Amino acid sequence: MAQIRIHEENTRIENEVEVSNFLQGEDVLYEKWNISKLPTHLKENYSLTDENKAEILTLFSKEIADVSERRGYKAYDVVSLSNSTPNLDELLINFQKEHHHTDDEVRFIVSGHGIFAIEGKDGRFFDVELEPGDLISVPENARHYFTLQDDRQVVAIRIFVTTEGWVPIY
């Protein structure tokens, strides 16, 4: 279950209903998908082959199709980041630059953890700490950035409005 941390106050929201209500109030789509169908060989596997990535997409194809139909998404892929990722520190520096997109930024966490820091409607930033099974859609034009949690590893399905993917606007 995702958790929220409000930067300015350093307060946390950890209750499932309160997290869902908070995100809904910020126009952030949040869903919990069933991660238990992930087979053992893909759990906590951060060195994925193309076949592994295709298997992950197949496992969650119904959920991807459902959210895509509801929200107009057109493309998707799987990304894996860990300490074995070449230039991970450089990638994280780039990810941590505050930006926005002209379309939604959607991620479903398969393994590991990630954090989206999002500027709320009141101008204050909050973190959405994500774990396996969490799907988030950061709304278009919302200022945000992404980083990893202390374990520095994540496998995520990225879902896009266009086949070109997101274009960051700094």
Curated annotation (Swiss-Prot):
Q: Where does Ni(2+) bind?
A: 99, 101, 105, 144
Q: Which GO terms describe its biological process?
A: L-methionine salvage from methylthioadenosine; L-methionine salvage from S-adenosylmethionine
Cite the binding residues for Fe(2+).
Answer: 99, 101, 105, 144
Q: Which reaction does it catalyse?
A: 1,2-dihydroxy-5-(methylsulfanyl)pent-1-en-3-one + O2 = 3-(methylsulfanyl)propanoate + CO + formate + 2 H(+); 1,2-dihydroxy-5-(methylsulfanyl)pent-1-en-3-one + O2 = 4-methylsulfanyl-2-oxobutanoate + formate + 2 H(+)
> Required cofactors, per record?
Fe(2+); Ni(2+)
Q: Which UniProt keywords apply?
A: Amino-acid biosynthesis, Dioxygenase, Iron, Metal-binding, Methionine biosynthesis, Nickel, Oxidoreductase
| Site positions per UniProt: May play a role in metal incorporation in vivo | 98
Entry's cofactor comment: Binds 1 Fe(2+) cation per monomer.
Give the metabolic or biological pathway.
Amino-acid biosynthesis; L-methionine biosynthesis via salvage pathway; L-methionine from S-methyl-5-thio-alpha-D-ribose 1-phosphate: step 5/6
Q: Note the superkingdom of the native organism.
A: Bacteria
Site (described: Important to generate the dianion): 107
InterPro entries xref list: ARD (IPR004313), ARD_bac (IPR023956), RmlC-like_jellyroll (IPR014710), RmlC_Cupin_sf (IPR011051)
Query: Record keywords: Metal-binding included?
Result: yes
What role does it play? Catalyzes 2 different reactions between oxygen and the acireductone 1,2-dihydroxy-3-keto-5-methylthiopentene (DHK-MTPene) depending upon the metal bound in the active site. Fe-containing acireductone dioxygenase (Fe-ARD) produces formate and 2-keto-4-methylthiobutyrate (KMTB), the alpha-ketoacid precursor of methionine in the methionine recycle pathway. Ni-containing acireductone dioxygenase (Ni-ARD) produces methylthiopropionate, carbon monoxide and formate, and does not lie on the methionine recycle pathway.
Q: Which PANTHER family match?
A: ACIREDUCTONE DIOXYGENASE (PTHR23418:SF0)
Quaternary organization:
Monomer.
* Family designation: Belongs to the acireductone dioxygenase (ARD) family.
Q: What is this protein called?
A: Acireductone dioxygenase
Protein source organism: Bacillus mycoides (strain KBAB4) (Bacillus weihenstephanensis)
User: Gene symbol?
Assistant: mtnD
